[in-house]
Amino acid sequence: MATKPQDANTTSREAITSKADSPPRPTALIFDSGVGGLSVYQEIRQLLPNLHYIYAFDNVAFPYGEKSGEFIVERVLEIVTAVQQSHPLAIVVIACNTASTVSLPALRERFAFPVVGVVPAIKPAVRLTRNGVVGLLATRATVHASYTLDLIARFATDCKIELLGSSELVEAAETKLHGGVVPLEVLKKILHPWLSMREPPDTIVLGCTHFPLLTEELAQVLPEGTRMVDSGAAIARRTAWLISSQENVISSQDENIAYCMALDEDTDALLPVLQSYGFPKLQKLPI
């Protein structure tokens, strides 16, 4: 049974807005296991700058790429439910490829609001490749997911798809966003299977939302002219369409906020980064 947005304690700060009132400010939850979802959030905010944004990340169970599908589904349901109990959500974006490949059906069954997922951009990469070799760079869970293999079977029959799963690259992206430096030698080691090929992929699918955060570093390691493709812009367009198609939404006056699952020294260090993205507060989500 779908869960409806909570409204019992929000009437003083939020109101049902009709088209005759001022432009509504519906609430969008962007969720990822870590900070990679900020790359998707940036794309969405460019199209929809006036939404009320919530960013939630699971720093307790991060990274998801090594977790079982059952664990991920239960965890994502728990987190989205906890956010929904405090905020009237208009839409949820699961900005995590690994979580999207396993949790979307369960989320859509439980909640009434639309849920958007992130999937590897196989189809556009196939259109862009010049040498017919496309690389999919993702977590191990995404690389081996049946959904990913189905995308390849449907859209890449005329191409050679080279799969490379790496949780180390996810950690590198987290390091960069926390202010650290990612040594190029680390990336070269991760990408060695491709770099050692006689004809490496000329188009790379960034199949994890963390990886667009490393495009500058990846460009220095990959062969010159290699194209990198992600699904952030497509997810933003889908989100904008779903928001615009809603007749009545609950408009929030709250500030943007970020939630983590535990507060520690790492989250303290991350707060200035989140503030630079437009999230002035970081709180522990009560789950």
From Swiss-Prot:
Residues 1-25 are annotated as: Disordered. Residues 1-15 have a biased composition (Polar residues). PROSITE patterns: ASP_GLU_RACEMASE_1 (PS00923), ASP_GLU_RACEMASE_2 (PS00924). It comes from the Bacteria. Keywords: Cell shape, Cell wall biogenesis/degradation, Isomerase, Peptidoglycan synthesis. The active site is at 96 (proton donor/acceptor), 208 (proton donor/acceptor). Belongs to the aspartate/glutamate racemases family. This is Glutamate racemase. It comes from Yersinia pseudotuberculosis serotype IB (strain PB1/+).
